[in-house]
Structure formats: structure tokens, C-alpha cells
Amino acid sequence: MKIERINDWFARQGRWMVQKRWLVLSLFILVFAIGFTGLRYFKVSASWENYFLEDDPMLVKTKEFKDIFGNDNFAAVLTQCDNSFMKENLELIRELTNEMMDSISYADKITSLTDIEFMVGNEEGMTIEQIVPDLIPTDAASLETIRRKAYMKPHIAERLVSKDGTLSWIILKLRTFPKDSVWNKGKNAVSPEVLTGNELEHIITKDKYQKLHPKGTGLPYVTAMKMKWIGKEMPRVMGIAALVSILILLLITRSLRGVVVPLITAAGSIVIVYGLLGYVGMTIDSGMMMIPMLLAFAVSIAYNIHIFSYFKRQFLLHGERRRAVEETVGEMGWPVLFSALTTFAALLSFLAIPMQPMRFIGIATSSCVMLAFFIAITLMPVLLSFGKNGKPHPKVQETGGRWLDHQLGRLGESVLRHGTLILWIAGLLTAALIYQFTKIETAFDIERTMGRKIAYVNNLLEVGESELGSIYTYDVMIDLPEDGLTKSPAMLVRLDSLAQKAEGYKLTKRTTTVLNILKDLNQTLHEGDAAYYRIPTNPEEVAQLLLLYENAGGSEAEYWIDYDYRRLRLMVEISSFDSGEVERELNDIAANAARLFPEASVTTVGSIPQFTVMMQYVAR
């Protein structure tokens, strides 16, 4: 009796909708217009930091790091030519270096073959000069002198130019990006991360630099290229989804209304939900934007097919259009609502994951499902109510249904007869699938998740596989208990041990610390003797070296040691991303840092730790 009362209630609503069909259509158009207007406030982000909630420990640690050392992101370019030490190539590398520094909005400090702090000893101690002079010579002897100078210090050369001289590496440090509240204004706001990547792409694609075959890298560049690719791919994917939907609807409904209304339902639910999210100021991750759209298409087709099929059956039985609409809403309202509610509840489970994109999926997909239901149960019946009555179909009237109705009925009877067997088969399949489910690996590796057929992914992977280039980085910040401790040779030796440990990892391309400067300076002051490429043995000597470096105009050290001489930074560049290996290496470097510096606070930050934490949130 209870289900009959529910069906009666839905039937009354169906009767009311038919009577007030123009009002129902007007309300739908009004709500659609409100949602469409809200799309102007719709903001798409590709920042990895936006994956985390505001109070997430990872964001707190990252903010602390940036307050001390600045931006942990970088933008870089790998160049490739026959000989980097030819005059025209050196001029192009210098021009590219200067343009990156001048034209990228958040540029801070750049290092390249033509712009580097190259320390040379003199009578006063040492001076900082360039490997490549301001006026690049044309004669072979002078160019060979530049080559010899570039390779004079192997620890410098391995960061700038390949052994055969065909590759060069340009790396740009970036100023700290402002908070979202600073830039996220207006309808065409672009995040600093994407802006930086777009500016780099604009520079390296200029015709004048193509002789260098420049390839960009760095997280801002990866993010911008991802946004650009999604912007091109999304219309194609949605177009394919719409085409497949139309073909399915044509095959099943064979009716114009049966094709158009589900598409309106899908588009309406997407526009209204995304518009409302725009009004409330929710930022949407570019990689997740299509998921609610595709789900909206799927449920819109399913719900409307149920409604249309039942209407068509009833209409063929007695030919009374409005009566068929009322019967359809009465009989299909509760089953479709129940289906929508279960899907809605399941999708809300995404809200339990402490990540912004997952919560967006939970909110957007569940909202699209419920809106698709409301639009389907109102718009489809209302539009079906327009038109003349028809004559009952003799065969349908005689048999009580169409051929497919009878076949599905027989299938149901067969299921009931073989219930035990079906349960056993379902149980075995479920057990097998649960076992296979344990083999699923959560990964952010662009090669495995996107593939080399995508041009920008292939370029990035080639950069990582090259002798010089890297794609991602992570940082280890060591916060010692007292100011001045970072001048202690004992602490610096521990830092050196940690860097050497990191260099032994499978994924590490290179490491950078303040020791690169101190060791180089110590060697320079001892007439370039390679035996002195080491850490000084007493604190006073360390302090004198740092003072001499600053007086000579050096500024690189401030990125690796703080002004209070309390905190040290180790940056590790990696060439590729292997989820399991990265997590193992991060855990190992953190454990070794804690062992070497038991009295210090050790923090790992950067894109790689963020990816790892995200995988843990999703998978565990």
C-alpha cells in the first residue's frame, strides 16, 4: 500500500505538471538562465596546491618554506644544437636567457651558460664573472677558450652544458606567487602558475629560437600545458559524448523528443550546477572538470530512456497522451528517484577525502545527478504532453506490451528460476574483481596516465631523459634549534652526507645546497686546486667565505641558507615520476635527515611530496 501511495503522489504531480506545463517550462528556462549567467564567475585552476584544504599540514609546511626560501617552483628550458659554443648559438642562448628574465612576470634569478656566478680567484681573493664575455668573439681560438672555461669546473659544467656541448640548461627561479585573493578577481583571471607557463611557452615557440630546439619544463610549464591540452581536448570529448548519446537515443527512442530532451537534461544540469558553483566562488581543477559532465550525460540518457519508454508503451496501449504522461510520472517517478538518490549518496562519499578536487567531484556530480532527475521527471513529461492523441496500437493492446517488453519479462522469469546459480557466478566474479582491485596503483605519472602521444608530455619526458634536464623537484628544509648553527662545519658535513644519499637514489638527477657555493669558493681561493673542493674545517672560515661571497656581489646563497643562519635547504631534482619509488625515496630521505639532524625540525616540501600525499589521501 505504501508504494501505491507514493505512486499516487507522483501521478498527482504529473497531472499538475501537465496542467501548468507553461509554468514548468518557464521555471526551467529561468533556472537555466541563472545558471548560465553564473558561468562567467566559473574559475578553473590547475595549481597542485589547490588540491589541499586550507589547514592541511602539507600546505602549512609549504607556506613556512616559502616564507623563508621563496618559491619552490622553477621554470627551465633545455636547448639542443650541434655546438652550443658557436657564436650564433651563444648569442641565441643569451637572448633566450635575457628574454626569460625580462618577460616572465615572476622571474627572480636565472642561471645559464651565459648568465652564471662564475667565481675566479684574484689578488684580492676572488671575483664573480661570466663564462661568456659581453662581446662574443668570432674566432675559433676565443670560442675554444670559452669552452675550456665552461668545463674548467666539472661541478659547474654538469649543471649547464652536456659533455658533448650539444645541450644546455637554463633554469629560472621564480618569485613567490601571490595568494588567490590577490589575483583571483574577475571572470578572466589567470593563476600565476599558469601565467608563468604560458609566458615560457610564448618565448620558446618564437621562430628565432627554433635553431636551439628549446623544450620547456618546470611545474608552472607542466600546469599551463595541461590546461591548454584540456582546453582543446574537452570540446572533442564532449562532442564525442554527445554524438554517442544521440546515436543511442535514436536507436532506442526513434523520436525527436526522445533525442533532444535527454541532451537538454544533460546540458541543463551541467550549466546550472557549474553556474551555481561559479556564484559561490568555488575553484575547479581543470583535470576534474569533465568528470561531472560525462556523468551528467550518462544519467540523463538513462533517466529519460526509462521515462520515454514507459510513456511510449502506455501511449500505444490507449492513445491518450495526457493520461499516458500522468501514468508515466506515477509509475516511473519513484523508481527513477530511488536510483538518483542512491547514486547521489554514493557520490557524496567523495566529500570524505580531504582534497579540494575530490570534494568538487562529490558536490558537482551528486548535484548533476539530482538535477538530471528533476529535469527529466519534469521536462520530458511536459514536452511529451504536447501533441494530439493517437489510436491504440492493436498488437500492443492485445499483448499488453511490445516485443522487447516480453523478452525482458522472460529474462526476469529466467533469473528467478536460476537464482542460486546466478548468485554463485556473481560471487565468484566479485571475488576475482576484488583481487584485481588490489593491483590498482594510484599514480600522477604523466607518461602512464596520459602517454607519449601527447606532444607536450613527450617533450617533458625527453627533457627528463636527457643528460641535463629535470621535470620535478622536492626540497628538504632543516630548521636547527639556534641561529648561526648552519655555519658549523659539523652541520654542513651532515648536509653533505644527506645530499650524497639523495644523489644515490634511482630518480635523482642532481642535488643543490649552499655547499655547491662554499666548496666552489673554497677551491677558487686555493688557486683552483680540486683537492679543496670541500667544506672548510672551522666556523670562522665558513663565515669569512660567506662574507667574501656577499661582498663580491654573490646572491645565489640566499636561496639555500636563511639570513639567521639557522635553516638549510636541500633541493633534489628528479627526471621522472614513479609513484612507488618516489614514496620510498621521500620516506628514506626524511628518515636520514632526522637521523643526521636529531635536534632539528625536518620538512619535505615541493610538488613531489604533494603528489605523494595526494596519492595517500585517495588510495588509503
Task: Describe each region flagged by the PLM.
Residues M1-F28, E326, F374-T430:
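Interfacial helix-loop-helix hairpins and adjacent transmembrane helices
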Residues S26, Y279, S300-S309, G333-A352, ...:
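Transmembrane alpha-helices and their membrane-interface boundaries in multi-pass membrane transporters
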Residues L39-F85, L90, A140, E144-V161, ...:
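Solvent-exposed, non-transmembrane loop/terminal regulatory segments of multi-pass membrane proteins
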Residues E49-L53, S255-T265, V280-A296, F350-C368, ...:
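Membrane-water interface of transmembrane alpha-helices in multipass transporters/channels
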Residues D67, P137-S255, V493, Q544-R620:
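Extracytoplasmic
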Residues G231-I284, A352-Q356:
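Interfacial segments of transmembrane alpha-helices in multi-pass membrane proteins
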Residues Q314-L341:
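Helix-loop junctions and hydrophobic alpha-helical segments within the transmembrane domains
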Residues R410, S414, H418-P539:
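Juxtamembrane segments of multi-pass membrane proteins
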